[in-house]
């Protein structure tokens, strides 16, 4: 894989626009559409293969299968389907059908009750239809975008938490999915923090995944569900956005692997992007009085989990609290301003191993 250029993919919005354009052309030409060229929001021309092409009286239905490229995307393979009827009105009426979420909470830039088709894809879909209508006797259209299986796909997203119910969102600012990019996930992290702020929440909990989020909810049962935000590997994005949105208190909950990377100053913690620095962990161990032979054992450990096992056996579990202290301090420095940060380390069963509460650069540690 070294040196191989990763393949770009296309967003649900781009595929929806292509399907809508194909359905419009089918109505105007009356001939099967095998391929359709569209203009993405970033003005790039792309040729899409049309999977479904069906004409029934005044209604045409076409679909395009999403290829996410080399991006690990739960909507890869989704069949974005457009059902179109042409009208004489000077308006394109767009709605979501089966498998497209409905907005039920404020703070998303869409009206409550509206289909979760974001503004840029919405504009792109309409533009592609109007492009086809030029020179025809029709001025508008009624369009329904649907995604077979969208409800199941949505279970792997943050949609329900954000108040997007019943399916996936039709997304994309450029039309392109960058392979393994930060773009899509970073956008969801930022959006979740903005929504928490919109609802008056001033304490958020940044977790590194589904398990740590569940454990965090058990540890902090009095917090609103919207307080809990999975940041994955992008802790730095979570911290910076917390500052931007004036969040009063940011709590980090994770396991030893990710927290050890944060303690080393790594704010993008993908396991392939950086490894745990066991030399750093052995230095921490020495700073709290761990015997040299144990410190050497820690330095030679294979993984952060292995370090935890060594500390448990040797009776020096206090290292977990020290790691939490350093994480809070490093995240505070990354924030670049005065922000209160707490850090909790849990094990793989959710047991609390260490914590640092209410660290602030102005007051230091309050354990």
UniProtKB/Swiss-Prot annotation:
Enzyme Commission (EC) number: 2.1.1.195
Residues spanning the membrane: none
GO molecular function: cobalt-precorrin-5B C1-methyltransferase activity
InterPro entries associated with the record: CbiD, CbiD_sf
GO BP of this protein: anaerobic cobalamin biosynthetic process; methylation
Entries under SUPFAM superfamilies matching the protein: CbiD-like
Keywords: Cobalamin biosynthesis, Methyltransferase, S-adenosyl-L-methionine, Transferase
Pathway as given in its UniProt record: Cofactor biosynthesis; adenosylcobalamin biosynthesis; cob(II)yrinate a,c-diamide from sirohydrochlorin (anaerobic route): step 6/10
Keyword Translocase: no
Record carries keyword Iron: no
Family stated for the protein in its record: Belongs to the CbiD family.
PANTHER family, per the entry: COBALT-PRECORRIN-5B C(1)-METHYLTRANSFERASE (PTHR35863:SF1)
NCBIfam families per UniProt: cbiD, PRK00075.1-1
Protein's name in the database: Cobalt-precorrin-5B C(1)-methyltransferase
Provenance organism: Leptospira interrogans serogroup Icterohaemorrhagiae serovar Lai (strain 56601)
Top-level taxonomy: Bacteria, Pseudomonadati, Spirochaetota, Spirochaetia, Leptospirales
